[in-house]
A protein has these predicted regions:
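A generic N-terminal leader/anchor concept
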Residues: 1-3
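Assembly/oligomerization interface modules of large self-assembling protein complexes
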Residues: 6-9, 16-122
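Long, contiguous amphipathic alpha-helices that act as assembly "spine/axial" helices in icosahedral shell
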Residues: 100-174, 251-261
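Sequence/fold signature of self-assembling virion shell proteins
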Residues: 38-43, 202-276
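Extended amphipathic alpha-helical segments with heptad-repeat/coiled-coil character used for oligomerization
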Residues: 179-219
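A broadly conserved detector of short glycine/acidic/proline-rich loop/turn motifs that flank catalytic sites
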Residues: 85, 196-198, 259-261
């Protein structure tokens, strides 16, 4: 049975507290408030909490007339994630030329074709659950729990996609001098500490820090990254395809889901690594 989860329109039963912990759901039909799925992803994603944008993208098509016959074709409108930096003025002495400044705008294209399908640089990610009828019947809110697991998985995958792109860019070692030279304010900096724990320590106030920057732990990389995460984003295609199959005559079931994600990092110069 094929289906689609609309990340922009569908709602998720609120089985979680603000920290993402599942609440105990009583048997029966509990009256719960609903939570938009895009908000749930933002709440779970570590890179989003560090400042990155999570873009739930629905391909926008534009009607374009052709020739004089009135025929219309649908054309996909290219979208971008853009960052821009301050373009300071410089003192120019009499008789001197103005120095050419670096172009202050950088952008990365979102790679979706006219049919909303994936193109180059957009990764396709899948997951699959298998369970029997006994499992299905033994949980009072089985479908809701599966939905929450998928949404949390999208958040984790978004983290892994963006952090993988940052690590692949081989950032320079972090120093406060480098951050100052890049025009990054202290309040913009956030750190994510990977499984190697490089540079991580807990200060006297119980706050995890890496190279002095407030940090959080992530299982999705080994390195430690410090940077201005507001200059990065992850695109998640708004439609997540879900297929439910019966895998045996005993009624065993499988749920398969497919999602398209793309890291968007126009400028990697505002990210650094922390050594061990």
């Amino acid at each position: 049975v094929p289906g689609i989860i609309d990340l922009l329109g569908d709602e998720l039963p609120n089985l979680q507290d603000k920290n993402g912990a599942l609440k105990r759901t009583p048997a029966g039909n509990p009256a719960v408030e609903n939570l938009k799925i895009d908000a749930a992803i933002l709440r779970q994603s570590l890179v989003a909490q560090a400042g990155a944008e999570i873009i739930i993208y629905k391909d926008e098509a534009e009607a374009v007339s052709t020739g004089t016959t009135g025929d219309v074709v649908m054309m996909s409108k290219q979208s971008y994630f853009e960052t821009f930096e301050a373009a300071p003025f410089a003192l120019v002495a009499d008789g001197s030329e103005v120095t050419v400044s670096p172009f202050p705008i950088k952008r990365t294209a979102l790679h979706l074709d006219a049919a909303g399908g994936p193109q180059t640089n957009t990764g396709i990610y899948g997951l699959r659950f298998e369970f029997n009828r006994t499992t299905l019947k033994s949980y009072p809110s089985f479908e809701d729990a599966i939905m929450h697991a998928i949404v949390q998985g999208l958040a984790r995958t978004a983290d892994a996609v963006l952090l993988g792109a940052l690590v692949a860019a081989t950032p320079a070692p972090f120093t406060l001098a480098a951050a100052a030279a890049a025009g990054v304010r202290m309040g913009e900096l956030a750190a994510l500490v990977g499984t190697a724990g490089h540079g991580a320590a807990i200060d006297n106030n119980g706050v995890l820090r890496a190279a002095g920057i407030a940090a959080e732990l992530t299982p999705d990389m080994a390195a430690t990254i410090v940077g201005s995460f507001a200059r990065s984003a992850v695109m998640i295609r708004s439609d997540v395809d879900v297929i439910v199959d019966r895998t045996s005559v005993q009624g065993d079931l499988a749920v398969t889901a497919w999602a398209a994600l793309q890291p968007l990092v126009p400028d990697t110069s505002r990210f650094w690594t922390v050594a061990a």
